[in-house]
Amino acid sequence: MSEAEARPSNFIRQIIDEDLASGKHTSVHTRFPPEPNGYLHIGHAKSICLNFGIAEDYQGQCNLRFDDTNPVKEDVEFVESIKRDVEWLGFTWSGDVRYSSDYFDQLYQYAVELINKGLAYVDELTPEQMREYRGTLTAPGKNSPYRDRSVEENLVLFEKMRAGGFAEGTACLRAKIDMASPFIVMRDPVLYRIKFAEHHQSGNKWCIYPMYDFTHCISDALEGITHSLCTLEFQDNRRLYDWVLDNISIDCHPRQYEFSRLNLEYTIMSKRKLNQLVTEKVVEGWDDPRMPTISGLRRRGYTAASIREFCRRIGVTKQDNNVEMMSLESCIRDDLNEHAPRAMAVLDPIKVVIENRAAGEEWLTMPNHPNNPEMGSRQVPFDSEIYIDRADFREEANKQYKRLVLGKEVRLRNAYVIKAERVEKDAEGNVTTLYCSYDAETLNKDPADGRKVKGVIHWVSVAHALPAEIRLYDRLFNVPNPAAAEDFLSTINPESLVIRQGFVEPSLADAVSDKTYQFEREGYFCADSRYSRPGALVFNRTVGLRDTWAAKATQ
């Protein structure tokens, strides 16, 4: 991460400052503990920036630990993608990658300790019965008939669970806390369940797997985590976090702190719903550029710096709030406006023939960035036949239209002034070719007679233009809060992807996916990492030059 990125201030950092000042802790140790059951999204980026950013700023450590306690939903594919995402965002974890499964032997022994203390029991209620016994927010639960088994019987039954002596769903290990607790999470929560599934790390060694709430706190303690940072939905779980650590023989007792999760407009963060988009082929995959996944944003052309800046701007609080999509888009625009080289691309081409110019190429020098000479320049060919965008020509127009009009002039970007003389149309009345004249004395300068030419349009040489598929990506949903809809799929934006067949200038022949360009007057684009290759270019629109949704919202 760049040292130039400002160090933020928030309530968590204030707590850390107080802990260090009081001597409660002499160093800071955080962790990022994703479950490897899907791809990380922009909400995870907030947690990554918080945990790794704190470790960096306080010269501490941050572990990457996979919460891999459910072998049915997890996959090595997700493990590898998460590691790539963390590294791409610019962070380095401390030591080796860790897995909760590394601690399965110790977790089992801690479960046995709770049984020996009379604080855990093997329950044989069915899942349906367990839900019924749990009670509701307004009604207390009731004790399982298996709750008062002896320590000896529970030890035998728990070992039987481990040995595969029970079928899935017929037995589990539960903590013995309080079925009348006002907090449902404390009503004898399940600590271990049976799953006959091969684990991507431990293989077939285990057929019982610890639950998240039991695993999380013990893993934190075993790793010496000082500040365990979670989103607000785990606030009630902190009671169970503390209960487990208070009742086992372990020296370290980390403290859990909660912050608000990221709610971003015009998208969804639910991993289940994101998976539904993928499995029902609403999108191409987890890295579809319309997805809020880090891999999707990366493929779309977002930079790691822009995502870090977004996380810095939205901050860390305890209050839930909805963040406008324009806040994220503003971060990438600011970044790319400063760093993206310029190029010309015509998305909806119309051919222009310059009749008073002899055929033959002329190579024009153009800056790669108008405000940064250090980015150098490039050579762009100009010829007597060029493409311009269809939207940049009208046969008739009012004075507010500053582009090319029949009988009037416009300037070609970094080139000459041209005048529209006549048009050629097809049988349907569509303009197919525009015939123009040019002023040979106006290369990057005003006409000698002082006449004013106000408009500037982009172009590419027909003889040198490279065909390209241009994918115009937009927001995936057409309402700010699709998660609130009865059927979130009904709010899909039908224009979230529009494909154009256009032309780009020859300097983009070898465009690579990790480099984003400003297509002048069109927006920011990058070569698609999956499909683009020399001779078959595919460009994804990262973001437009300005926010068009704000205008739509006021209409």
Swiss-Prot record:
Name recorded for this polypeptide: Glutamine--tRNA ligase
Family: Belongs to the class-I aminoacyl-tRNA synthetase family.
PROSITE patterns membership: AA_TRNA_LIGASE_I
Enzyme class at the top of the EC tree: ligase
Binding site for L-glutamine: 67, 212
Superkingdom: Bacteria
Keywords for the protein's UniProt record, in alphabetical order: Aminoacyl-tRNA synthetase, ATP-binding, Cytoplasm, Ligase, Nucleotide-binding, Protein biosynthesis
Subunit: Monomer.
GO cellular component: cytosol
Catalysed reactions, as listed in the record: tRNA(Gln) + L-glutamine + ATP = L-glutaminyl-tRNA(Gln) + AMP + diphosphate
Binding site for ATP: 35-37, 41-47, 231, 261-262, 269-271
Classification of source organism: Bacteria, Pseudomonadati, Pseudomonadota, Gammaproteobacteria, Enterobacterales
Segments carrying motif 'HIGH' region: 34-44
Residues spanned by motif 'KMSKS' region: 268-272
Pfam families in the cross-refs: tRNA-synt_1c (PF00749), tRNA-synt_1c_C (PF03950), tRNA-synt_1c_C2 (PF20974)
Native source species: Yersinia pseudotuberculosis serotype O:3 (strain YPIII)
A single BP term in Gene Ontology: glutaminyl-tRNA aminoacylation
NCBIfam families, per the entry: glnS, PRK14703.1
